[in-house]
């Protein structure tokens, strides 16, 4: 929490630590080798952490409910694998389903009043699916419903 400098490491834009745009590590950070590689290593991989964050920002910007909405945690639909919540803004609602597990999981969100999958994030070729109120979530995926 307060003392976690390794969690605040900057993006490796290059494998050359003296390249333009490279940041110094935060004070107190050890000599941690980042396992995801540099921008050059990640830019062409659609499932890289770089592209995941880029897509996350794009989705947030596309849906005001995500950026500015009020949050309701759907505890009855959440468990040790899935986190489900709704966000509402100006009369519009989205449902966000996060699978934080390395295993696939399903969620029945038919009672939340949404009918369409409008965005997703995935960390592999396996994509989330939504049909008849059931979200099928591969490992480490996110599904946005509206």
Pin down the residues of each PLM region:
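Loop/helix patches that line or flank the sugar-binding groove of alpha-linked glycan CAZymes
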Residues: 1-105, 111
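Short helix/strand-capping connector loops at secondary-structure junctions
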Residues: 32-34, 123-126
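Surface-exposed charge patches in extracellular/virion surface proteins
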Residues: 81, 112, 130-134
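Beta-strand-rich binding/interaction modules
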Residues: 104-124
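C-terminal beta-strand-rich structural cap/linker in extracellular carbohydrate-active enzymes
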Residues: 129-146
């Amino acid at each position: 929490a307060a003392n976690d400098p390794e969690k605040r490491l900057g993006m490796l834009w290059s494998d050359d630590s003296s390249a333009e745009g490279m940041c110094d590590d935060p004070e107190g950070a050890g000599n941690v080798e980042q396992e995801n590689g540099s921008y050059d290593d990640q830019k062409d991989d659609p499932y890289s952490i770089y592209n995941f964050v880029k897509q996350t920002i794009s989705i947030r910007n596309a849906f005001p409910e995500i950026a500015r909405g009020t949050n309701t945690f759907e505890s009855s639909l959440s468990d040790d694998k899935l986190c489900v919540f709704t966000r509402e803004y100006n009369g519009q609602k989205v449902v966000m389903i996060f699978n934080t597990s390395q295993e696939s999981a399903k969620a029945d969100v038919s009672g939340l009043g949404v009918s369409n999958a409008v965005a997703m994030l995935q960390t592999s070729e396996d994509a989330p699916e939504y049909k008849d109120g059931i979200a099928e979530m591969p490992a480490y995926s996110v599904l946005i419903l509206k």
